[in-house]
């Protein structure tokens, strides 16, 4: 039987789900905050940069992942919503083209207005977006490197915003970035736990299937703790952000003794994590506004 042709609305809907809309703010906000707090002005570069890190960047990051993880996603009962799309078998080429073409005009603009060091940061960010999932590197199958690479996806937009805006680097600013990076490592490690069985059956050698469910959970607890501690040494009101690590620790803690067989139960914690990010983001926004007022 001949498959029905894909309608544009159906393609758009699958690409939308594949881009993980619930996570858009996690990449756009760091860029916006870093750039705006450095330049103290809203300009075309800020607007286009936010749009780029809001949608095309996420479509590239998650869409490429959905293409190369298709077989494991078919075995994964949580796929098909906020956790990612199960693409129609005819969609992988469309997804890759959509990701590349949607990014292209933004990247061209950012290269034109940027400096050589900003080109380097942007190139590194996009390199890790692609080769986290794509062969030959497929970094998501290299334990611990997968968590670090995933973290780069989220803190690199902030680093790029700082570099593009010409920020002056201090050790305290470095601690803020390090704290964000540790949060990213912890979040990936926690998120990987729920897919132990599906990824192992698909032969995906990421941190959780290789090391078992408990190791990434303990890594997540350690990195969330270090992330909060790092903020204690930053400029006021930065130390208050250490409090924001506590809800993440409380979310992960109940699963610390989980077994591989019961790892799917961690999905409940991950669902809380997704919404916790929105609440934490609000707290970070208030602190950034306070910082902007103090330093204006």
What are these regions (language model features)?
Residues 28-34, 147-163, 208-213, 269-287:
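Small-residue-rich segments of transmembrane alpha-helices in multi-pass membrane proteins
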Residues 53-82, 186-208:
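Acidic (Asp/Glu-rich) catalytic motifs at the cytosolic membrane interface
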Residues 52, 70-122, 205-239, 278-282:
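Multi-pass membrane catalytic core of lipid/isoprenoid biosynthesis enzymes
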Residues 62, 128-140, 192, 255-263:
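C-terminal ends of transmembrane helices
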Residues 13, 22-26, 30, 45-53, ...:
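Alpha-helical transmembrane segments of integral membrane proteins
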């Amino acid at each position: 039987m001949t498959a029905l042709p894909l309608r544009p609305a159906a393609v758009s809907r699958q690409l939308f789900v594949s881009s993980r809309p619930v996570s858009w703010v996690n990449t756009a906000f760091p860029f916006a905050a870093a750039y705006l707090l450095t330049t103290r002005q809203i300009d075309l570069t800020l607007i286009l940069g936010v749009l780029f890190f809001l949608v095309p960047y996420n479509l590239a990051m998650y869409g490429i992942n959905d293409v190369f993880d298709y077989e494991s996603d078919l075995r994964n009962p949580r796929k098909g919503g906020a956790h990612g799309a199960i693409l129609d078998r005819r969609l992988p080429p469309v997804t890759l083209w959509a990701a590349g073409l949607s990014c292209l005009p933004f990247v061209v603009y950012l290269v034109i207005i940027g400096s050589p060091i900003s080109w380097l940061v942007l190139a590194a960010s996009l390199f890790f977006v692609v080769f986290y999932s794509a062969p030959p590197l497929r970094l998501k199958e290299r334990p611990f490197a997968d968590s670090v690479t995933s973290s780069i996806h989220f803190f690199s937009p902030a680093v790029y915003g700082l570099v593009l805006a010409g920020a002056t680097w201090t050790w305290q600013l470095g601690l803020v970035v390090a704290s964000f990076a540790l949060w990213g490592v912890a979040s990936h490690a926690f998120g990987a736990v729920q897919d132990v069985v599906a990824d192992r059956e698909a032969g995906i050698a990421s941190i959780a299937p290789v090391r078992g469910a408990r190791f990434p959970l303990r890594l997540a607890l350690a990195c969330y703790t270090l992330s909060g501690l790092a903020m204690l040494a930053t400029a006021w009101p930065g130390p208050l952000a250490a409090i924001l690590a506590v809800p993440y620790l409380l979310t992960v803690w109940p699963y610390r003794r989980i077994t591989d067989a019961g790892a799917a139960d961690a999905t409940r914690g991950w669902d809380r994590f997704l919404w916790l990010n929105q609440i934490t983001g609000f707290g970070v926004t208030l602190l950034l506004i306070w910082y902007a007022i103090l330093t204006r």
